Amino acid sequence: MRHHGKILTAGLLAAVLWSGAAGAETILSRGNGGQPETLDVHKSVGIPESWIELDLFEGLLSPGPKGELVPGAAESWTVSDDGKTYTFKLRADGKWSDGTPVTAGDFVFAWKRFLDPKTASPYGYFIDQVVNAKDIRLGTKPADTLGVKAVDDRTLEVTLVGPTPYFLATLTHHATFPLSRANLEKFGDDWVKPGHMVSNGAYMLADAVPQSHVKLAKNPEFHAAADVKIDTVNYFVTEDVDGELQRFKAGELDYTYTLPNQQIPDLQKTMADEVRIVPYIGTYYYTVNLTHEPWKSHPELRHALSLAIDRDVMVGKITQGGELPAYTFVPPGMSNFAAWTPKEAGETQAQRDAEAKELFAKAGYGPDKPLSVEISYNTSENHKKIAVAIGAMWKQKLGVDTTLTNLEWGTMQSALRKKEYKDIGRTSWIGDFDDPSNFLDLFRSTAGEQNYPGYASPDYDKLMDAAVVEADLAKRGQTLAQAEQLFLADQAIIPIYYYTSKRMLSTKVKGWQDNVLDNHLSRWLTVER
């Protein structure tokens, strides 16, 4: 899905809360990390955007209370015997927030827009398994050749290039949501603004104030509106993790986006009932800019920096939230994957340090030729502390001089996509669904802007292409493992740890169910005041 990313003054926050607090209205206040870049479902990337979009829109399928797949805009579907053709029957009562019906044509329109090279969606590769999708987004075939057809207003047919075990799971993702063609044609790029946006989910966009909040109101046209208990949802920008915690303690937030790492041990003692730390399918990593030297042609240099990071210290002393050291990109426990263990994962840190020094010297660096590195990260004390610790490890073991540059969430995401970060950039990937392809597709040469290092390997692409058409799940898992081994041997990124989701959750919030994708749609929750 996705990437992790000024908080309101107390007075302004209170004003936002009060503005929707008339009568018996139920309000949920969510800490949401960084400022959302956009609410255009085809152009957004990060978690701050995706959580809001999951409340605003509904795909063919939807994440249920436990993160499981449940019917969304489609009430049912069938799959052909060869596993290549999916036929979806849309709900008769599916409506846009303006009262017009949601049709199969809305999905066809949206998917064509999604793949249009002019849209330049960072997620364009996401439905490459659909017939001709890849060629359309690369501009080599016209949009009308896409393997998606509106048989009638309530019947959508999708044809794939081969059996795809995870296809249904992709349909909960914001990139595959429908859009109202009439709405986009009326407002153009301004369709995402409050008062303009038409959505088909449980909520409508009521207000959006940059660096402050996004306010959603219950959608009376939603097919399950009678079951939605929360009337208003406020998503607050909370890049200041310490400030976010203080506002939670003051009762201004019902739950937080994350926790200050250094305060986790104390919080687990003093506020144990409200601390939630659970497994999460995601990897925190540093990406290396391969568009220029010295990174472009020195894999041994990149590998040396990776080996010199003591990941056990990182998760034990710095993050302190139950994270696990990462030596691969695909998190442990993912389905349809032949899990493997890199050599360095079984070594001591002393062995890794010795190898790092050898590789560093082999790359031509040392006391007579020192290396200077800039680490860029999005604003967060948590990210800063990690970067400081890693810089200290590199200095102590390899003599590397490190400078830190922090950027606001949107600026950092732009720098990553455009390869404008100088040397190394902090980022992460959180699984959109339980399949390793969701992680490994990022580094195809045709993946576009989300290929942050600018990695390109014909051999890697061939393995990933082979996995797409492999019907045998065991063989497919082995092929994907081979692709990851090749990719990590090239060391275009530096995995650091596997995530846990960690936050404060008020005991007043009911209906919350932990899940490894950390999807918690507001429609499934309620708040007892």
What would you call each of these model-derived segments?
Residues G31-D81, H196-S199:
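N-terminal lobe/hinge region of extracytoplasmic solute-binding protein
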Residues T103-A110, D153-T159, P163, G201-A202, ...:
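Alpha-helical secondary-structure segments
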Residues V148-K149, V315, Q349, V400-M412, ...:
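Extracytoplasmic/peripheral linker and loop segments enriched in polar/acidic and small residues
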Residues A206-A217, N234-H292, G316:
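Extracellular/periplasmic solute-recognition and catalytic clefts
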Residues P325-K362, S380-K385:
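Structural transition elements
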Residues R503-R529:
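Long beta-strand-rich cores associated with HINT superfamily self-processing modules
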